Amino acid sequence: MSNPDLSPQQIRAALAHLGSLLPPAPMAEMVIIGGAAGVLSGALPASRTTVDCDVLQVSPPEMFDLCRYHAEEVAQRFQIAPQWLDASAHTLAHLMLPGWRDRLVTIGTFGPLKVRAVGRIDLIALKVIAGRAEDLEDLDSLTITHAEAEQLLELFPAIQARGISPQTYAAALEVLSIMRPKNES
């Protein structure tokens, strides 16, 4: 492996090959989050790279197992990290904003695999909650509007009610207050 970082083109090619390895039926829907979702949806700059493709959900569930199984073959073929398809993101489902499924953006259909990314406001919310250095850089690139910050402040209590830790919730509100524009320009 020469470069652990994946460009949007590499991610798209890997997803296309993954789709070609799946059986023709049933159709599967994969929902991605994180940097891959941001660059493939156009919310983040195409120059941004990521080490993986974070999978929030695949339905039907049995297709999730097949995707993970075939991900190793994709990694070998494209000489990318074996963990390029990160299934651990499904543990973040409780952090999704109300209505997130209505805001999904279609990335492409690769054989029987339809790949969708979280919408912009949901991507921003997840980056605010994560609050890591790379997430803060992404938030700078996303240039949060005043209206988006207000929308997040209205929706965040629903996440708190679903079990986010008090420390994580407080940290997310702090990040949002720092990133929040003071007025619309």
Where are these regions (language model features)?
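Compositionally biased terminal segments of proteins
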Residues: 1-185
